[in-house]
């Protein structure tokens, strides 16, 4: 894996201690709700089999792995950015903020943070800066990122299920807030409410129309 070709001495220390946090996000594309991120530090003495990119796992498998990760990980934390923050900052910067919150909230301070994707924000924990690397498709390559992907995905899906119970006419349980035909039809008929991202073009167009 390419990430291991650019390790610094500080990174090597991090690997030797095992304090590596994997970070991933879910929910950049939906029209509604928070963007959700997770940071996970796995226990090398309690390996978890079957970890992978959450999008490649069935809902049943994700739920089972979610419980196992919560039980076996040294620590994990969920970070998020609200629709209001997304509208203020834009989705990219809001996602970076949510990732920073996830890492800052860990009970243990990682020495290295591995982030899925092609960019990584500045991370700190208790005012101490942390080395980080971004890894393209890391959620299918690095166990801790896979675990973070699963924690974030299950968390956000459950929130969409709760939103579906409160607003059944929108069909959130099926489309999870993503811009599908059924979702567009629902907001055209019923309008939008506070948890919608008003800066996103389809929502903005409806509000301005």
UniProtKB/Swiss-Prot annotation:
It is an enzyme of class 3 (hydrolase). Keywords: Cytoplasm, Endonuclease, Hydrolase, Manganese, Metal-binding, Nuclease. One of its GO terms (cellular component) is ribonuclease H2 complex. InterPro entries: RNase_HII, RNase_HII/HIII, RNase_HII/HIII_dom, RNaseH-like_sf, RNaseH_sf. A divalent metal cation binds at residues 24-25, 116. CDD domains: RNase_HII_bacteria_HII_like (cd07182). One of its GO terms (biological process) is mismatch repair. It is found in: Cytoplasm. Endonuclease that specifically degrades the RNA of RNA-DNA hybrids. This is Ribonuclease HII. The lineage of its organism: Bacteria, Pseudomonadati, Pseudomonadota, Gammaproteobacteria, Alteromonadales.
């Amino acid at each position: 894996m390419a990430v291991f070709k650019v390790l610094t001495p500080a990174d090597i220390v991090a690997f030797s201690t095992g304090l590596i946090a994997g970070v991933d996000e879910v929910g950049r594309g939906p029209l509604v709700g928070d963007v959700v991120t997770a940071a996970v530090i796995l226990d090398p003495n309690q390996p978890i089999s079957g970890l992978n990119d959450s999008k490649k796992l069935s809902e049943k498998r994700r739920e089972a792995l979610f419980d196992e990760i919560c039980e076996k990980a040294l620590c994990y934390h969920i970070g998020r950015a609200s629709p209001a923050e997304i509208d203020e900052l834009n989705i990219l910067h809001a996602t970076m903020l949510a990732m920073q919150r996830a890492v800052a909230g860990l009970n243990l301070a990682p020495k290295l943070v591995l982030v899925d994707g092609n960019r990584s924000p500045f991370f700190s924990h208790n005012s101490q800066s942390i080395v980080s690397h971004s890894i393209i498709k890391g959620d299918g390559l690095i166990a801790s990122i896979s675990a973070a992907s699963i924690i974030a995905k299950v968390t956000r899906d459950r929130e969409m299920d709760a939103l579906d119970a409160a607003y059944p006419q929108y069909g959130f349980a099926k489309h999870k807030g993503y811009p599908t035909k059924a979702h567009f039809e629902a907001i055209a008929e019923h309008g939008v409410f506070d948890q919608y991202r008003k800066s996103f073009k389809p929502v903005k167009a409806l509000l301005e129309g």
